[in-house]
């Protein structure tokens, strides 16, 4: 990709038209002009009175390297010869009020390590990728009809060195990737890696959208990390925040002394919940900045997906007492998704949206926002509220566990057990569970069993896989020493077996987005808090029966209606002794009894374990048996309507 000479740029291409390669115009680019090697600096500052480039090379003297205004709308540019890579710099901006302010480059691809805030000249074009095989394999499979397990993590607190310092991108490739492969996760989702000044913002309050944070190394180091992930078959999803940004003095806020990237109207500019300001998504230059940024991460870092943060905050104005939709944001999100899928039709665009906004994952040509996945926040909130309730009272909120099936096919959903639910006093997943020590582990195993058998792709935050007891501490690493304790080892073994079972069981993912893939057996047993259902694959014989018991009671000879196969085997029981359970399992092959039950033509009698999930698989189809009514009903699949764009 060549750097475009700013003096040749038609102003309409950036100021009034869709222009998604703005990173080729703006920023600091190492070039040769008039046979001299140096750096061309270009920036947009529409209300600046004067602009300069400052750095160690001119002792930060803003009188030395004055920039030239090349468009009336405020593009400034300057070529400085003999500057080399790794020079640090900022823009000195004389405002209309006569003040001089110093700003980092909005398009810088590298920055100083915090607490320093200058931008760094860096040639990002030289990395040699080795992931062609990954790209080919990705195109051969449709994620909609495949298993998808996402490991969400915070790069700075997954694991730290003995002296408390951070692992680099390259070191994390050596530490993290084998762990992810061992657990059979298909993707990792990393909390924001854009440059940000404050560690405890977790990256959600950025200053450098084009700069991979230097906390962990150079852009090439991050490219190496992604390359290694692809080598081992792991997709990489990044958290991305196009809705708001931080107010630190060196960043985008009041960039030229006036609202530039943010709304001018204070009522909609400020975001009081986070202490940030909202991007002006109605401004063409801002849209080009953000959409170019998304494509930049795709093209230069080979990212496989974005989890778009705080979509609800974008969709609605945050004026007090108002629920009015923000049409700027709606049209921006549609434009963003159209641009992303034009670049890569296999990309993952996931909306973190807690509202009931319709058609989030429908294509824009059907009136949708154009994402292909959405976090199921409703499922997460309902299920965790149910699990935190004392078991004897769960029967009174039975609908918390069934309500999601009324809407689960309205969108393409990911089920998130995310970082938001294990921080700020909310407790870890394990510690949310009521009861004594044994009860907590049993119920977490039960929760995971329900999680992996409910329709929708899966996402788990780091530490959940071995039952982290304390909630997430963002300045510390995970409690890896918990592996010294037997119950945590049992939990870890159970989770690995459960995820392996999920991946090899087509009924648990093949029809995730089709009503054909799920059928209740009994959704109404609130008195015993027992739920049973069928997960179905493309073929009739690809079926699993799932029974979940959310109380501590054990039931012998419990009748469960099942599709008419001759035998069933129990392929997983969360109460097995090897997982730390009491051993109430069904070891023998279960022969079906030819008596109707639960609206099925046959049933089996099983032992229901305390706080347990039991998964049954048919062994042999009864000769001459008829297909169960409703087991393969013809319903328009969301995969067809939302999968292709």
UniProtKB/Swiss-Prot annotation:
Origin superkingdom: Bacteria
GO biological process, one term: glycogen biosynthetic process
UniProt-annotated catalytic positions: 309 (nucleophile), 352 (proton donor)
GO cellular component: cytosol
Biased composition (Polar residues): 636-645
CDD domains referenced in this protein's UniProt entry, alphabetically: AmyAc_Glg_BE (cd11322), E_set_GBE_prok_N (cd02855)
Listed EC numbers: 2.4.1.18
GO MF term (any one): hydrolase activity, hydrolyzing O-glycosyl compounds
UniProt keywords, alphabetically: Carbohydrate metabolism, Glycogen biosynthesis, Glycogen metabolism, Glycosyltransferase, Transferase
InterPro entries per the UniProt record, alphabetical: A-amylase/branching_C, Branching_enzy, GlgB, GlgB_N_E_set_prok, Glyco_hydro_13_cat_dom, Glyco_hydro_13_N, Glyco_hydro_b, Glycoside_hydrolase_SF
Region (Disordered): 619-645
Pathway: Glycan biosynthesis; glycogen biosynthesis
NCBIfam families named among the record's database cross-references: branching_enzym, PRK05402.1, PRK12313.1
Quaternary structure note: Monomer.
Known role: Catalyzes the formation of the alpha-1,6-glucosidic linkages in glycogen by scission of a 1,4-alpha-linked oligosaccharide from growing alpha-1,4-glucan chains and the subsequent attachment of the oligosaccharide to the alpha-1,6 position.
HAMAP family with a match to the protein in the record: GlgB
Protein name, per record: 1,4-alpha-glucan branching enzyme GlgB
